[in-house]
């Protein structure tokens, strides 16, 4: 398919400012599809990430990139990225990633100038805030969060110097943080004592995308008074466009997150380096093999997953099974033996069984099968900050004076995000 050839004399003089700018749109649904089209036509290189699929029931809210009915059943991010290809300027790219935020680490965002959170639950927004704030300021992208509520549209742009994403979330909303939301709060209202999902339109979704695109445009150009502002569009009968300056929330747990003081760099990516290969690089830097690589720690939906499950028991019959997965990526169906899985045997409560303690760290002389696994398959997300511990003779972690901790990251992860299509 031939690309569109734009007449430069009919375009804005500042358009060249956008050509080397990469943007990640997290959530390729109602707002996200509108954003992808706008960003492509602005001359950006927009990537999209979403784990969900397009359905016919939501077709009326998506941007015109999505074709009905042929795109039903396709991954949202891959589909949106595919549809914008003819709109991209020469030299610009777009990649669609079938994934969720749990499989990304901080460094996965470091190659982007802007990250737009067009997601509809607070858990994802809180996790994104954690990941972004773990990046040093010189590699930290500007964040835009947008959404809709009824026919109102809103967008907030922030650089994490005055407040963070968590500051924009009322802690009362976190009681059910997985509920469908927008940036204004839960999209559920009480009607006659019953909860009712608030409905929004394509107009509201496209307006939210337009506000975000305008904030990005003005930020790139360098207009004053753009950064750390909230734009709100209110529809008739109270038509209004307002600007507000959000404030830092007192004792905000998100603002308390800071990047490591120092990061040591390894070559490659978690996608193609084995545990043995990583340990060899770490040993060269530390000058010793006497260290431990902590299993990746994932804190999501108020649960901490920090173990690697080597073996467990079938949660149907109790027979021993090999798992070899990070506990944050284990689903109930993964904990059945082949016989019970084939018979679709019902799962019993985990409390019915005795379990082996998962690994909390990997060591130089560990099991060979684990040593040969790729880091990503061991649970380290793309862009991970990997903690390495040297005990230096300490008997336990109470003897903190002897223990040293070093953070490592891979120098290829920030580029790999533009190549992969599924995590």
Located regions from the model:
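Extreme N-terminal leader/targeting segments of oxidoreductases
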Residues: 1-18
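Glycine-rich phosphate/adenylate-binding loop
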Residues: 15-23, 31, 35, 104-423
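Glycine-rich Rossmann-fold phosphate-binding loop(s) that bind the pyrophosphate
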Residues: 27-29, 51
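Hydrophobic residues within alpha-helices
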Residues: 35-36, 80
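Gly/Ala-rich phosphate-binding loop of Rossmann-like dinucleotide-binding domains
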Residues: 36, 40, 64
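Conserved S-adenosyl-L-methionine
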Residues: 41-45
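Glycine-rich phosphate-binding loop and adjoining beta1-alpha1-beta2 segment
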Residues: 49-89
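A structured beta-alpha segment of the ubiquitous adenosine-cofactor-binding alpha/beta core
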Residues: 72-126
